[in-house]
């Protein structure tokens, strides 16, 4: 496990402007399972997703207009991902606001996938404990008008993806000062990743998600209410 600069103290380690949500936001999909699926696109759903695995109490619902709510209390082996977003993903200004009160491992993050190459990526906005499942490699940091982020990569071997069970790379941008609400200009992160040698492929979907998961004896709990535009 690498030593993180601003993460060294950790263990192991939304915004309804206007009257209507954009047409690219949808509340039609609420896909829920109790075991890992074989195809992550089915698991994640698309524009709105709610996926769970293992034990624990994970309750998330789409409220319409780009808003979703979650409450969770995990146990060993449990986890969930829920969020609202866009398909395809890509360069855009994602505005969000709301509340996020979390304990244990998990994130409030913009989460997405690309193909060719197959990349799973996170832009992490807030968290309690970051407890990566795989070792992270630091790739640098960057600062712009929205804040300072540290960059990491990791690799997952023979895990579920939007292309079935595959080995793929994960990209991470992690804020040095946590926030809940603001604008995420995704293109700025894509550019910073590219300069660090982190090359994305063709964009599939992306969501502003709440995620919680158990890691050893560390268990997640909390609540969130997030609106995305």
Which stretches of residues belong to each language-model region?
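Short, surface-exposed beta-strand/loop "edge" segments at domain boundaries and coil↔beta transitions
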Residues: 76-79, 102-106, 117-120, 179-184, ...
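Short N-terminal edge-element motif at the start of the domain
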Residues: 43-47, 53-102
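Generic recognition of long tandem-repeat/solenoid scaffolds
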Residues: 58-61, 65-73, 146, 150-152, ...
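Extracellular-facing segments of soluble proteins and assemblies that are Gly/Ser/Thr-biased and enriched
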Residues: 81-144
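Long, compositionally biased interface segments
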Residues: 180-229
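Short, surface-exposed loop and linker segments with low hydrophobicity and enrichment for Pro/Ser/Thr
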Residues: 81-104, 161-168, 186-207
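An exposed acidic His-Trp-rich patch
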Residues: 116-180
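Fungal secretory targeting signals
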Residues: 1-41
């Amino acid at each position: 496990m690498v030593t993180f600069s601003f993460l060294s103290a950790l263990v192991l380690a939304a915004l309804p402007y206007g009257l209507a949500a954009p047409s690219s936001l949808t509340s039609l999909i609420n896909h829920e399972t109790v075991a890992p699926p074989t195809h992550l696109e089915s698991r994640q759903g698309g524009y709105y997703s709610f996926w769970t695995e293992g034990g624990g109490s994970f309750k998330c619902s789409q409220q319409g207009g780009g808003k979703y709510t979650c409450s969770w209390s995990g146990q060993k082996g449990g986890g969930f991902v829920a969020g609202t977003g866009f398909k395809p993903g890509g360069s855009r200004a994602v505005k969000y606001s709301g509340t996020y009160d979390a304990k244990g491992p998990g994130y409030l993050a913009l989460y997405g996938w690309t193909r060719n190459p197959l990349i799973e990526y996170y832009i992490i906005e807030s968290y309690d404990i970051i407890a990566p499942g795989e070792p992270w490699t630091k790739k640098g940091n960057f600062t712009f008008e929205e804040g300072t982020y540290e960059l990491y990569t990791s690799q997952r071997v023979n895990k579920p993806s939007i292309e079935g069970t595959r080995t793929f790379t994960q990209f991470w941008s992690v804020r040095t000062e946590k926030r809940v609400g603001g604008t995420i200009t995704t293109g700025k992160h894509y550019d910073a990743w590219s300069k660090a040698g982190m090359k994305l492929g063709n964009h599939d979907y992306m969501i502003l998600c709440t995620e919680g998961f158990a890691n050893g004896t560390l268990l997640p709990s909390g609540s969130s209410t997030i609106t995305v535009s």
